[in-house]
Structure formats: C-alpha cells, structure tokens
Amino acid sequence: MSLEPLSEYEAVVSEMVATTPTTSGKMFGMPCLKNNNGKAFAGYFEGTMVFKLGSASHAEALAFLGAKLFDPSERGRPMKEWVVVPVEHGSRWLEFARDAFDYVTDKKM
C-alpha cells in the first residue's frame, strides 16, 4: 500500500472494473463506482474512500481509527449506510469495495 489516496483509489477502480460489472462515474461531484444498475457503492472523497455497506462490513469499517459515517454536507446529516475509511486502512479498500458492490447489487431497492 502506497498511502497515496488517489493511487489507491485508482487501483480499486481498475480491479473492480476488471472483475465485476462496474463503471466509474460521479456522485455529489466525487468520483465513484456504480454497479450495472447505476447504483453507487463506493467513492473517493477528500483523500478517503467511502463505501455503502451492509451490517457486518459496516460495523467492521466503522471500528477503524478515523472511520466515520459519511456526511458530505458536513451538517450533521450522515448517510447512515455509508462509511468513510481513511487511507491508513487503504489495504482494505478493495475488500470493502467488493462488499459494497455485493450489498447494493443484492439489495432490493
């Protein structure tokens, strides 16, 4: 792991696009990953990655030092399923991206 956040994010994007029906796009102006139904499941935000996670992965990600619920407006209205995971835990970003992909792809919307 390089601790270069953008490089780490780009590596996750490359792997996800190569191994799953994933595209890159934008959400709230940030680069993100979307499944083949257009549902965003991960993104790059201010040198971190954010992930939309189900309960087990959500709790695991939130337990990391520096992790928190994603509040893009910074007005105390976090997106409860989304977790910010700092680059210090970038070695887990791909794993969480896979979990997030599975979560949004399997979730009945």
Identify the meaning behind each predicted range.
Residues 1-109:
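Charge-dense, helix-prone N-terminal extensions
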